């Protein structure tokens, strides 16, 4: 399907699509097609062939050259700083996005609120359950703010968070720009006996109060400058201090689910990816908290192209230029530049740091052979490795379809 349909279609698109501009949304442009061509050609590596890797590198280099020379041919661009990429003011006309998509909702376009709020729902997926602490509550007012209040379903693994620890022991600057680690109270709150016990506070905390707007929750990493000071007052402070070590077990590379004889309540609080946060909503039904996120989601952006070039260079040239591509991304982020030769794992780790939460990881691990057995997961996420089967590298055709026809087995993904 790559050879006969996907790649020829993208080559045709590169030739015939318009250049577009930064305001172009949903409709693909020439740079979108070229970026996807680079990505798709690289993905064919999972089939143990280098046939399309030269085309992947060539497409990536065209965009890189254009980006570094002003973008006159394709409009390629990379923001000078990492935080500009996900600043909400840059969302609608994001210069770095090679392709982005926005949904529309409004009273002129929908007569019912039954489904018109189901737009870009990425903002609903990554927030930890801050409402497990009484100074926070899930309400409509908070849902419309950038920090939000709806608990998500995606929690960073121990492995992911430790990718942000640099060789000198400091945190990669992208960590605190990508993850929210503290929240203010959105209601008045008074500590009670139950909360004291749940969070290991001293007896004197009972009766102490937090007012709306006060610091309520603070997650601290061992690499933070104020880590020791914050941990030293964990049982006395009138706000909730969550130590990384209360949530993650570095030795076992997993999440700590039990504390003493009971549940570990700290596990509900973890660094929460904020790339998809929004304060731009269409309110379909306020009483039911049905709000449609009007922000765009980025399908592919320029920083990824440098990492595609790095990986393709490893396959074709032994990585002679790979570290240079990787360090372009790191330099923009303000991270420590890497030295030595780059391996595929070097690229994978950098993709984890730069592209976390941008829905690339499954394809990255599949492409690089990390799903051939459970060894990669055993080293990075052993709790998950116990349940892994090689067939999980394949996407199944839904049984809703296959069970509804007499010859459904013929349509299942071969090998699943």
Q: What do the PLM-derived regions correspond to, one by one?
A:
Residues 5, 85-160, 267-299, 323-331, ...:
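Long, intrinsically disordered, low-complexity segments
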Residues 173-327:
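C-terminal substrate/ligand-recognition segments
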Residues 21, 48, 71, 190, ...:
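Residue-level detector of alpha-helical recognition elements and their boundaries
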Residues 2, 11, 34, 39-240:
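An aromatic- and glycine-enriched ligand-binding surface/loop that stacks and positions planar moieties
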């Amino acid at each position: 399907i790559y050879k006969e349909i996907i790649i020829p279609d993208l080559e045709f698109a590169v030739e015939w699509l318009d250049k577009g501009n930064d305001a172009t949304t949903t409709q693909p442009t020439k740079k979108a097609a070229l970026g996807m061509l680079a990505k798709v050609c690289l993905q064919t590596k999972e089939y143990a062939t280098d046939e399309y890797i030269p085309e992947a590198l060539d497409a990536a280099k065209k965009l890189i050259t254009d980006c570094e020379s002003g973008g006159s041919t394709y409009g390629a661009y990379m923001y000078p700083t990492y935080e500009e990429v996900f600043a909400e003011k840059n969302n609608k006309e994001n210069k770095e996005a090679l392709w982005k998509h926005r949904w529309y909702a409004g009273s002129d376009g929908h007569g019912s609120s039954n489904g018109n709020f189901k737009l870009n729902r990425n903002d609903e997926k990554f927030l930890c359950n801050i409402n497990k602490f009484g100074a926070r509550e899930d309400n409509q007012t908070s849902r419309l703010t950038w920090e939000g209040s709806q608990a998500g379903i995606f929690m960073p693994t121990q492995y992911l968070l430790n990718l942000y620890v640099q060789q000198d022991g400091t945190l990669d600057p992208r960590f605190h720009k990508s993850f929210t680690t503290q929240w203010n109270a959105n209601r008045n709150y008074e500590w009670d006996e139950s909360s004291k016990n749940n969070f290991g506070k001293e007896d004197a905390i009972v009766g102490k109060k937090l007012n709306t707007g006060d610091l309520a929750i603070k997650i601290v990493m061992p690499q933070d400058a104020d880590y020791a000071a914050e941990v030293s007052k964990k049982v006395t402070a009138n706000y909730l201090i969550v130590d990384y070590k209360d949530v993650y077990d570095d030795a076992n590379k997993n999440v700590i689910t039990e504390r003493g004889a009971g549940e570990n309540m700290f596990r509900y609080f973890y660094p929460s990816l904020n790339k998809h946060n929004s304060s731009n909503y269409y309110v379909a039904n306020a009483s039911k908290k049905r709000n449609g996120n009007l922000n765009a989601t980025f399908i592919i952006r320029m920083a990824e192209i440098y990492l595609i070039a790095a990986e393709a260079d490893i396959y074709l040239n032994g990585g002679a230029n790979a570290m240079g591509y990787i360090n372009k991304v790191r330099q923009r982020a303000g991270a420590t530049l890497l030295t030595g030769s780059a391996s595929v794992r070097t690229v994978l780790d950098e993709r984890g740091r730069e592209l976390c939460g941008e829905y690339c990881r499954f394809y990255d691990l599949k492409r690089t052979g990390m799903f051939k057995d459970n060894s990669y997961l055993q080293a990075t996420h052993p709790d998950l490795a116990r349940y892994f089967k090689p067939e999980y590298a394949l996407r199944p055709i839904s049984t809703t379809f296959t069970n509804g026809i007499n010859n459904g087995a013929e349509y299942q993904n071969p090998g699943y």
